[in-house]
Amino acid sequence: MANHKSALKRIKQTEKRTERNRHVRSTLRTFIKRVREAAAAKDAALAKEALAAAIPVIDTAASKGVIHSSNASRNISRLTKLVNTLG
């Protein structure tokens, strides 16, 4: 247990940020999963819609520091390539 006031504050801040990051990461995974499921179902129109919705979520997660910018770029690139193979 923390003994200093500043350490107690840091613990609270960490818990708050962890919860916020967990929510962003969960949302991110959900949107990525929607794109992959649409691609697996060979539904090009749905996959394109899902990709268009997923890209801003991925970029937001990167700008908030939840994921690295390279990770965001890699995800967007791979998902775009996947959707483009559907035609």
From Swiss-Prot:
Any matching Pfam family: Ribosomal_S20p
Entries under SUPFAM superfamilies matching the protein: Ribosomal protein S20
Comp. bias regions, Basic residues: 1-11
GO molecular function, a single term: small ribosomal subunit rRNA binding
Annotated region described as Disordered, given as residue ranges: 1-23
Keywords, ordered alphabetically: Ribonucleoprotein, Ribosomal protein, RNA-binding, rRNA-binding
Keyword Aminoacyl-tRNA synthetase on entry: no
BP terms from Gene Ontology: translation
Annotated GO CC locations: cytosol; small ribosomal subunit
Transport keyword on record: no
Similarity field: Belongs to the bacterial ribosomal protein bS20 family.
Function: Binds directly to 16S ribosomal RNA.
PANTHER family listed in its UniProt record: 30S RIBOSOMAL PROTEIN S20, SMALL RIBOSOMAL SUBUNIT PROTEIN BS20C
Annotated protein name in UniProt: Small ribosomal subunit protein bS20
